[in-house]
């Protein structure tokens, strides 16, 4: 959701996971980076989201985000490193920064040049799909295990 941080998403997680959820795409952190949310808090929030999903037998795909260098070089580097660290820790696929080829491209972005438009959303789906498809194939082929 627009302007939400990883903490906001964590607070809504239980509601988002109601029903027969089998795969979760976690694409969070851009607003954390813009607001200078401490990287350790970002990692804690993302860890809680991933742990909760995995405890319910929900497969997770993690999408890397990047922080603009407005909060200093150390922050930017730590933010960049958080995603591969979490992907390794939880053994989940890591999608490279999905906006990499869209930034500054007016054909892919809304007039604010921050959020993708419909064409940008399709491009994001194209980037994520190779990481998502194997999980969809596995997790939709058999009846789902109880998660609670």
Identify the residue ranges that each predicted region occupies:
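A short beta-strand-loop structural module common to alpha/beta enzyme folds
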Residues: 1-5
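Alpha-helical cap/lid subdomain in secreted, periplasmic
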Residues: 8-148
């Amino acid at each position: 959701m627009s302007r939400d941080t990883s903490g906001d998403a964590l607070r809504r997680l239980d509601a988002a996971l109601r029903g027969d959820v089998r795969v979760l795409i976690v694409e969070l952190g851009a607003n954390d980076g813009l607001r200078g949310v401490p990287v350790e808090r970002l990692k804690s929030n993302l860890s809680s989201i991933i742990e909760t999903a995995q405890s319910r037998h929900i497969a997770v795909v993690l999408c890397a985000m990047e922080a603009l260098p407005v909060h200093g070089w150390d922050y930017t580097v730590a933010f960049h490193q958080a995603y591969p660290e979490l992907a390794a820790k939880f053994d989940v696929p890591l999608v490279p920064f999905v906006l990499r080829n869209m930034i500054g491209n007016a054909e892919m972005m809304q007039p604010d040049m921050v959020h993708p438009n419909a064409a940008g959303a399709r491009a994001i789906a194209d980037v994520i799909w190779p990481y998502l498809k194997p999980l969809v194939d596995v997790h939709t082929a058999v009846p789902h295990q109880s998660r609670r």
